[in-house]
Amino acid sequence: MGLMIRSSSIHAAGCYTTSRIAKGVQVVEYTGPRITKQEADARFRNSPTTYLFGIGDGSTVIDGHGTAMYINHSCDPNCETEELDGRVWVMSLRAIAPGEELTYDYNLYDGDEDDARCHCGARNCRQTMYSSEEIARQKKALKQKARRAVEAKRRKAAAVTQAKKGGKAASRSNARKKATRR
C-alpha cells in the first residue's frame, strides 16, 4: 500500500493513498517517541501545532513522527485510530480510493485554552476538532462560569445595598444621639 504526503485543502499537508485500501485494514502506525503528558505540555507550551497523540489513560503521548502525523482531522473520516498491544494504528473505516486523503476524527479532549477550529469541509462538520463529549463539557463549564459571575454580581449588589442602608441607619442614629445631647 502506497502513501504519499502532499498539499491538503484541510490543513497544510495531508497523507494520501496511491492505491485502493479495503475497509478494516491497518493503514499505518502512528509512531514517534513516547513522552509523559507533563513533558509534552512543557515542551510544546508555545507551539500552535503539535503532532501529539494521547494513549491509554492520556498520561503518555506519542510525539508523532513519520507518515501518520500528516493524517488530518475530518468530522466525516475514512479512518479511525485503534490501540493494539500498546501501538496505535490508523485503520480504514471504509474502502478508500487511490488519490483520496486519509482522515480520522481527532476527538480532542482537555481543551480549555484552544478552540481547535475544524476546516474539514464535511457536511456534518462540528466546526471544532473536539469530541462531542468535550464540547458538552466545555458548554457546561461556560454555563457554570456564567452562573458564578451572575451570583457574584448579585452578592456585590446586595452588599452595596446593605452598606447604603447601614450608612443611612447609622446617620439617623447619630442624628438622634446629637438631638438627645442638646
Regions found by a protein language model. Name each.
Residues 75-182:
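C-terminal SET catalytic tail plus cysteine-rich post-SET Zn-binding segment of SAM-dependent SET-domain
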Residues 1-82:
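Catalytic cores of histone-lysine modification enzymes
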